[in-house]
Regions:
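Metallo-beta-lactamase
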Residues: 1-25, 28-138, 275-290, ...
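Accessory terminal helices/loops
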Residues: 1-4, 89-97, 104-295
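Short strand-coil-strand connectors
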Residues: 25, 48-50, 324-326, 335, ...
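A glycine-rich beta-turn/hairpin centered on an aromatic-Pro dipeptide
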Residues: 290-336
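Low-complexity, glycine/alanine/valine/leucine- and proline-rich hydrophobic stretches
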Residues: 318-369
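Glycine-centered positions in the ABC transporter ATPase nucleotide-binding domain
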Residues: 374-377, 381
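Conserved small/polar residues in nucleotide/adenosyl-binding loops
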Residues: 392-398
Length: 399
């Protein structure tokens, strides 16, 4: 089936006030900004005509993620809770249906107010209890194994851990306020996993004996421990099939036990890859139309990401850049291979001056000749400077 064309149109209007009322196609909507909740930019929307409250992903019929396993900035559980309560204060007494990006709507004013209060309580509890234990000197993993939701909150279906989990959300709060370092100096500059595993196996000695013991622990249901010790054996020797298969069996059991769909998928995917290997999927090409919606500064940051700065470390270049469709000028420097830029006055001693539309910048970043042809209007000075950049474009350019 066709999935259509993915593209992006920049917003024609931006909500900037804490609450703002706008008519959209004749329908009055009240927008409530909720930044740094489920995402850095988020908002709830109340529709008075229907007494309907859209909660985006701030209330989602399940425990959500303060940290998402796919990778993203850690979310602020305290702000999340407070914005839900603000929505309750603003709209709670006049709402008859609440709906959101995932899961089912909720009807009835009393039900809705309980739903919002209980959801806010979950995120507030995770935030406050984690900080309490941080102040007592416990580490991230210790706290994740200490905290349990209050029994009454744990019994509510829409706060269950079907997506986010208490354990990884606790670790998210720890990460936000304390970072990765747990004050144990042996963790400052740890050996990478393969080197560590090889040394540990050297100390353990007979790996067959280790596997024999691990199988006994597997039979006792100690799946997490079995996964951890066999993971060490696999890192030390990826060709050790007995270790791979036992690790896969342990991960599979952990997946079967997981209430969270995200955890279950992670466990079962890990088990599959241990048994069958991993595939070399091609890099995603992304949507040029979507990328063209980026600001010029974001596009230049993207260009810096796409350049292999290690290979460029001997290069020192100065480029005057005019972005004609944004009516903006920048001074770019490749300083010891690092791309830095500012909107300061152009240099009289620049290696090159490039006049281009935004598409040209994106074309260089993605090594896309079609976009370069469409965007780059003029290059003065060192005409090979773009070729130099393209020569050192990394694999990230294809993503």
């Amino acid at each position: 089936p066709s999935s259509g064309t993915t593209t992006y149109i920049s917003p024609s209007y931006e909500v900037k006030k804490a609450t703002e009322t706008i008519k959209v196609d004749g329908v009055e909507m009240v927008f409530q900004l909720t930044p740094d909740t489920e995402s850095p930019a988020e908002m709830n929307t109340y529709i008075p005509k229907y007494k309907a409250l859209w909660m985006a992903e701030n209330c989602s019929g399940t425990m959500h993620n303060l940290y998402t396993l796919r990778g993203a900035e850690v979310r602020d559980g305290n702000a999340w809770a407070q914005y839900i309560m603000e929505a309750k204060e603003l709209f709670g007494d006049k709402t008859e249906v609440v709906f959101q990006a995932h899961n089912w709507p909720h009807w009835g004013n009393d039900v809705i107010n309980d739903y919002m209060a209980n959801t806010a309580s979950v995120y507030k509890y995770i935030f406050s209890q984690t900080l309490m234990y941080i102040n007592q000197g416990y580490t991230s993993t210790e706290i994740a194994n200490m905290i349990e939701l209050p029994d009454e909150l744990n019994k509510i279906w829409y706060t269950r851990q079907y997506y986010g989990t208490l354990k990884h959300n606790v670790k998210a709060v720890y990460q936000k306020y304390m970072g990765w370092y747990d004050e144990n100096p042996i963790h400052l500059d740890e050996l990478e996993p393969t080197e560590y595993s090889k040394k540990l196996v050297e100390y353990l000695g007979d790996t067959d004996k280790v596997l024999e013991m691990a199988k006994k622990d597997f039979d006792k249901g100690e799946y997490q421990w079995v996964a951890q010790i066999t993971n060490t054996l696999v890192y030390a020797d990826p060709e050790n099939k007995d270790a791979r298969y036992l690790c896969a069996d342990a991960l599979e059991q952990l997946g079967y036990q997981a209430e969270s769909g995200a955890w279950r998928n992670a466990y079962l995917t890990g088990a599959y890859e241990l048994r069958n290997g991993t595939k070399n999927y091609p890099n995603s090409e992304g949507s040029g139309a979507t990328a063209l919606g980026m600001s010029t500064e974001t596009m230049l940051d993207y260009l810096g990401i796409c350049l292999d700065e290690k290979k460029l470390e001997d290069q020192n270049l100065v480029i005057n850049l005019e972005v004609t469709d944004k009516n903006a000028k920048y001074l770019l420097r490749i300083n010891h291979g690092v791309l830095i830029y500012s909107q300061e006055k152009w240099s009289d001693k620049a290696d090159a001056t490039i006049k281009t539309k935004s598409a040209g910048i994106l074309g260089i970043a993605q090594n896309n000749q079609k976009l370069m042809d469409a965007g780059i209007e003029k290059v003065e000075g060192n005409s090979d400077i773009i070729k130099t950049c393209l020569l050192y474009t990394s694999d990230a350019a294809d993503e």
